[in-house]
């Protein structure tokens, strides 16, 4: 059994007190939740502290909370902010764990079959396991997630039933524990000890939980009784503390057993017979032969190995669901009274709505042409109405709420005033002729003041050409695009703040929620090209990126002023006047937000060449205290020895060089 802690309260830690619009917004939202309001909207302008407001609401209502974000970059930023506000509670991160993902597909026009190909990020997989285990263990949990949260995850009941619970004094044979660990997909490896593995030394069993990468559990036996449970540093073996009870969660979210597997394979066989008869009656003999060959092979693998490539396509049979029933998702791991916060809801909710249709169109081709059984269609994301059925209470959060939110509720809480006194940026419209020379001049002015610049373009080609052009002029520039891996996007944002880059060029990634106070200029190229990227809502969001700096300004390069441009400028001017009046009344002088630069998510890296230095480790070294510097060097030395022990001499040599550089820097 899992001892779920339901008496833990959220502990908000902040040196700030709610000011401006925040106290009223917090009170209204809290009252709405306590009064049973199903849906509310927090209409908050950029830089007004919406995350801080929501944090106060979470503390007040004390409910497990899912914060839904529309992209991984913003999710990573929110994760860092909530961790800072709630250091004593469980703040988790749940996004797709694929660094690269090519879904299975078939293109009839060219008779091209594309096999599924993917690369899994181990760090994100760990964070996903941490999220689900926290939800089952405690009540004070905030999970920041992308739309990955509405994709299939496995039955939470099966996952919970497979948890191995261990207590000091418990009678259990050592070998029985080993069998339990293997049953929940842990792998025995006495030499390469890492997540999801265990090792055995006599009466001592060491277990590395799937949800952690720094601490392992040491279970010591005396005969057939657990004598002691210790938490140890996985790298050094140093004892961190003793535990009376531990719960070992499965190493995979997709748990099954022999009975379920037998029932599933029998069901798949029955469906295969029906589908083959259907295809043959329609004269689709090639499709029937293809389906029979592929499915028969999968069934053989499932019986012999308990697994096959693409097993997720049989998830309906594995879960015991009926045709058309929704899959289990992260939402099923939450208790029924959880709170949902949809960040940048005007983008996130349309994204949630579109997930099912896109997935269905691709899979229908696979079914029609004999690559998959019809049950594969039930391996899918949730439909919008299915997501709505999970919602207990929701707060839609946006500076520009969309039509969907307006249909759900008329309970709108406004938050326009910034506690910092910062004004919405000034907006200047300039002609397209000579825009490059003008833009470079503006960028150089910001560089002289140690400020940063965002430039947003309409196409990928334009962004790439602009990036190359600025690089040729010696400007430190980065191009933020969709091909960049999840955690690297967050790192690029951090590097911009640190001054490694002065300019960031993007298309659709420099909008909602990107929070960089050093940015004082946002340049919008082709602002008069009406469309999705240049409509009123998009322009207001883009303009908001310059609203966190007291020198914030926006330049729109356009030959005419469109209705969208005018509406965005009018709304910005309205908000600016409200803030000016508030500042005058309270004697506030606008000041740029001072925000600490921190690593949001630890990313494990490996150098491609032995001669490269671990700059990602050393980047903040000179800013550390002497004591912290020595601790970091000691830890890197441990990592170096561990890498050498695993015969990873390339990594060991790289760490050695980094350590030598650090010791030289401190004069050791």
Curated annotation (Swiss-Prot):
The keyword Nucleotide-binding applies. A motif (Beta-hairpin) lies at residues 97-120. Transmembrane segments: none annotated. ATP binds at residues 44-51. Residues 31-188 form the Helicase ATP-binding domain. The beta-hairpin motif is involved in DNA binding. This is UvrABC system protein B. The gene is uvrB.
């Amino acid at each position: 059994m899992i001892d779920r802690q339901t008496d833990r309260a959220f502990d908000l830690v902040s040196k700030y007190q709610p000011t401006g619009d925040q106290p009223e917004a917090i009170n209204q939202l809290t009252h709405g939740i306590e009064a049973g309001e199903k849906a509310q909207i927090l209409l908050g302008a950029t830089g007004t502290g919406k995350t801080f407001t929501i944090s106060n609401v979470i503390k007040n209502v004390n409910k497990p909370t899912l914060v839904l974000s529309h992209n991984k970059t913003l999710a990573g930023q929110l994760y860092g902010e909530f961790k800072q506000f709630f250091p004593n509670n469980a703040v988790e991160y749940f996004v797709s764990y694929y660094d690269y993902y090519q879904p299975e597909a078939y293109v009839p026009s060219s008779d091209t079959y594309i096999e599924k190909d993917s690369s899994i990020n181990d760090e994100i997989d760990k964070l996903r396991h941490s999220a689900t285990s926290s939800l089952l263990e405690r009540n004070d949990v905030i999970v920041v997630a992308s739309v990955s949260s509405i994709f299939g995850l496995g039955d939470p009941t099966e996952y919970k039933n497979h948890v191995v619970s261990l207590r000091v004094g418990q009678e259990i044979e050592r070998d029985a524990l080993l069998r339990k660990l293997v049953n929940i997909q842990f792998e025995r490896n006495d030499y390469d000890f890492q997540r999801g593995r265990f090792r055995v030394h006599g009466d001592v069993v060491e277990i590395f939980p799937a949800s952690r990468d720094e601490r392992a559990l040491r279970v010591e036996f005396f005969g057939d009784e657990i004598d002691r449970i210790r938490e140890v540093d996985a790298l050094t073996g140093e004892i961190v503390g003793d535990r009376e009870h531990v719960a070992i969660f499965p190493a995979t979210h997709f748990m099954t057993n022999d009975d379920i597997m037998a029932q599933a394979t029998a069901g798949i066989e029955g469906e295969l017979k029906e589908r083959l008869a259907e295809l043959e009656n329609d004269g689709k003999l090639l499709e029937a032969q293809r389906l029979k060959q592929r499915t028969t092979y999968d069934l053989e693998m499932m019986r012999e190995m308990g697994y096959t490539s693409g097993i997720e396509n049989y998830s309906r049979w594995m879960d015991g669901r009926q045709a058309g029933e929704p899959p289990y998702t992260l939402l099923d791991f939450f208790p029924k009274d959880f709170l949902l916060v949809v960040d940048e809801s005007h983008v996130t909710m349309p994204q949630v709505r579109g997930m099912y249709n896109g997935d269905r169109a691709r899979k229908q081709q696979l079914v029609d042409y004999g690559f998959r059984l019809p049950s594969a269609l039930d391996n899918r994301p949730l439909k919008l109405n299915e997501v709505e059925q999970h919602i207990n209470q929701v707060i839609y959060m946006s500076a520009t709420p969309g039509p969907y939110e307006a249909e759900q509720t008329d309970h709108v809480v406004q938050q326009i005033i910034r506690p910092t006194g910062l004004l919405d940026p000034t907006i200047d419209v300039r002609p397209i002729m000579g825009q490059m020379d003008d833009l470079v001049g503006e960028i150089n002015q910001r560089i002289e003041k140690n400020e940063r610049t965002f430039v947003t373009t309409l196409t990928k080609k334009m962004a790439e050409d602009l990036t190359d052009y600025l690089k040729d002029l010696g400007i430190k520039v980065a191009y933020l695009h969709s091909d960049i891996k999840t955690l690297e996007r967050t790192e690029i944002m951090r590097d911009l703040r640190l001054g490694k880059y002065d300019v960031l060029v993007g298309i659709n990634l420099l909008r909602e929620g990107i929070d960089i106070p050093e940015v004082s200029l946002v340049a919008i190229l082709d602002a008069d090209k009406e469309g999705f990227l240049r409509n009123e809502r998009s322009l207001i969001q883009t303009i908001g990126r310059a609203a966190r700096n007291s020198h914030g300004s926006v330049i729109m390069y356009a030959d005419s002023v469109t209705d969208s441009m005018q509406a965005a400028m009018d709304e910005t001017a309205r908000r600016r006047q409200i803030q000016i009046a508030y500042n005058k009344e309270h004697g506030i002088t606008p000041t740029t937000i001072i925000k600490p630069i921190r690593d949001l998510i630890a990313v494990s890296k490996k150098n491609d060449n032995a001669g490269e230095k671990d700059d990602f480790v050393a980047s903040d070294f000179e800013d550390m205290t002497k004591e912290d510097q020595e601790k970091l060097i000691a830890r890197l030395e441990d990592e170096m020895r561990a890498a050498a022990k695993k015969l990873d001499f390339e990594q060991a040599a790289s760490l050695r060089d980094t350590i030598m550089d650090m010791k030289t820097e401190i004069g050791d």
